[in-house]
Regions:
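Conserved Rossmann-fold NAD(P)-dependent oxidoreductase catalytic core, especially the SDR/UDP-sugar
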Residues: 76, 100-141
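Conserved glycine-rich Rossmann-like NAD(P)H-binding loop of the short-chain dehydrogenase/reductase
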Residues: 26-37
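NAD(P)-dependent short-chain dehydrogenase/reductase
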Residues: 151-205, 210-214, 245-247
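Active-site helix of classical SDR
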Residues: 95, 141, 145-148
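N-terminal Rossmann NAD(P)H-binding glycine-rich loop of SDR-like oxidoreductase domains
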Residues: 4-24
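NAD(P)H-binding glycine-rich loop region in Rossmannoid oxidoreductase-like domains
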Residues: 53-94
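C-terminal substrate-binding subdomain of Rossmann-fold SDR/epimerase-dehydratase oxidoreductases
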Residues: 190-280
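SDR active-site strand-loop-helix element
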Residues: 7, 32, 74-78, 114-120, ...
Length: 280
């Protein structure tokens, strides 16, 4: 039986990881949630206990040590990811400090395996294909603090003989997505018969359904593979074609308005991941 503690369990990615793990045998789940979300896991079979916090990133190392008793695996998903604000928010620093306290507590505990969540934005995005050995070159506070956590925990857990996995997520979409994100925004606009104002759409991205990403994360949490993992589709597609696929389901290609928004400054032309983990 594997006792798994999960942070960020109610979020976009975390909820799907919870659902994926809840379908597996020999798993006990211990999600950490904010106090106001007490009843969210009522229908989950594998949830054995729920830990509550007002602010996970302000908890002390001693608080974490108590929560880690009898835990075998930690999946750390929690982070500040408010749409439109997270990339250069100073709250990334709080997330880094809080995550390092968790890491220190894990290093001193009986936990065997730690899965952290990173981002494709850690890489040098001038490269055409992004492999786990592609040079890192983070450009914003979000990716910089993620790299800082990755490099710190990688060394710490090597010293302490803990298994460490770092899952770099690419462009996820699907259930529970913030309605301001690309896929959810297009769905919302077309459902209401409204135009979806988009950029040129020429950018190439590696999109993956969050459910598929969650399956990869849940599977690797119970695996023996260690190190950095790209969680991606390996199927690059232009934003224009991605949007057109969604619009085709509604029969409303006419509502896609490309070029109505400016492309983001310094936005990469291509973000294309190469998997290094057997998704099956």
């Amino acid at each position: 039986m594997n006792n798994i503690l999960i942070t960020g369990a109610t979020g976009f990615v975390g909820m799907q990881v919870m659902k994926a793990l809840d379908n597996l045998k020999n798993v006990n789940l211990f999600p950490i949630v904010r106090t106001k979300k007490k009843n969210i896991f009522k229908k989950f079979n594998n949830v054995k206990n729920i830990y509550f916090t007002k602010d996970i990133f302000n908890e002390s190392e001693d608080w974490w040590k108590k929560k880690l008793v009898k835990i075998d695996i930690v999946i750390h998903i929690a982070w500040y990811v408010k749409h439109g604000k997270y990339l250069d928010s100073e709250l990334n620093i709080n997330c880094l400090y809080g995550s390092l306290r968790l890491g220190n507590a894990v290093a001193k505990s009986s936990v065997k395996r730690f899965i952290g969540i990173g981002t494709c934005l850690e890489y040098n995005l001038k490269k055409r294909k992004l492999r786990v050995n592609t040079a890192l070159d983070p450009k914003n506070l979000y990716s910089i603090t993620k790299v800082a956590l990755f490099t710190s925990l990688q060394k710490l857990f090597l010293i302490k003989k803990k298994e460490f996995v770092w899952c770099r997520l690419f462009y996820l979409y699907g259930e529970g997505e913030d309605e301001r994100r690309l896929s959810a925004y297009i769905h919302k606009q077309l459902q209401n018969g409204l135009p979806a104002k988009l950029t040129s759409g020429n950018q190439i991205r590696d999109f993956l359904n969050v459910r598929d990403a969650a399956k990869i994360i849940s599977n690797i949490s119970l695996d023996k593979k260690v190190g950095a993992i790209n969680v991606c589709s390996e199927k690059p597609i232009s934003i224009k074609k991605f949007a057109q696929r969604i619009a085709a389901k509604y029969g409303r290609l006419d509502l896609l308005k490309f070029g109505r928004k400016k492309n983001f400054l310094h936005e990469p032309d291509i973000v294309w991941g190469v998997m290094n983990y057997d998704k099956t």
